[in-house]
C-alpha cells in the first residue's frame, strides 16, 4: 500500500471520547502514544484523522506493533518504577491484560522481531524477549550498563544493539552457534526434558558520547548512528569492526531520537528542533525550526513522509521528505512513541 500521496498543510484536532470507535482501524495505521493522556491514538495516515484513542496505563513511552498489525505493545516506563507492557487489540480497539515483567523494571525500548516482543529493562540493566504464543518471557540478558534505553534487533535475532544512556555506551550482542546441551534426566515415568540451547552470546561495549540515547541502523546494516544528547554529537559505528569510525559535530544538544530514511540517504535527528543530515557526507543539510520540542521519529515505509512527536506543543508533525518541510500535523497531547501497524 502506498501512503505517500501529496497533501496540503493539514491540522487535525480529532477529539474523540475514549469509548468511541466510530471508525475501523485502517489496514495501515499510524500509532502515537500520549504521555499526557496515557492513551494510544490510532491514526489514519491517509486522512491524518484519529480514529480511536485507547487507555494504555501509566507513563507510556514506546510502542510497537506485531507483524500482522493486529496487536500493539506499549512500555510503561516510570523511570524504573514500573514493570508492565500494555497490550492493545488494534482491530477491536480495546485494551487487553497487561504483561507483568516482574523484576524487569523500567521497560522502555521495544522491537517486534521473529514473532517476539523485545524490550529493555533499565532498572534491571537488562533486555529480554516475550513470546506472545506462550505468554511467557523466554529470554533475559544483562547488559551491565546504566540506563539501557533503546533496542534494535536484527532479523533472525542473532544480533542486538542497545544504547546505554548514563554509561555513554552502545552494547552489541552477537549470538554464536553451538550444539545443544545434553537433555536433563527426566523424573521417573516421564519423557526426557530438552537440553539447554546451544551457542552463547558475546557482548561488545563501545564507548560513544555522553547521554547516548536515540540511534538507528542504516538500511544496509553496515553502520549504527548514535545521538549523544550530552555532547550534541553523533557517533558513527562500523558494525563489522565494532568501532566508532566518525564523530559528527552536528550541534544537536539534547538529541534523543535518530532515524535513517528508508533509502538510507538522510538521517533525521530530534534535538529541540528537527535536524536533517546527509548520510554520505555526514553533514547537516537542514534544520527545521518550526518542528519544535521534538521526540519520537517514524518513517513512512514508502519514504514519502516522516512523523515527528512534538511533545511540548501537543502534536505529531508530518514531514515531506522530498521538500524537507513540515506539511501538516495531528493533535496528540504530549506525544512520544510512534509506530506502524500494517495488516495484510
Regions found by a protein language model. Give the residues of each.
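Bacterial N-terminal signal peptides that target proteins for export
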Residues: 1-9
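Predominantly soluble domains enriched in secretory-pathway, periplasmic, or organellar proteins
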Residues: 13, 18-344
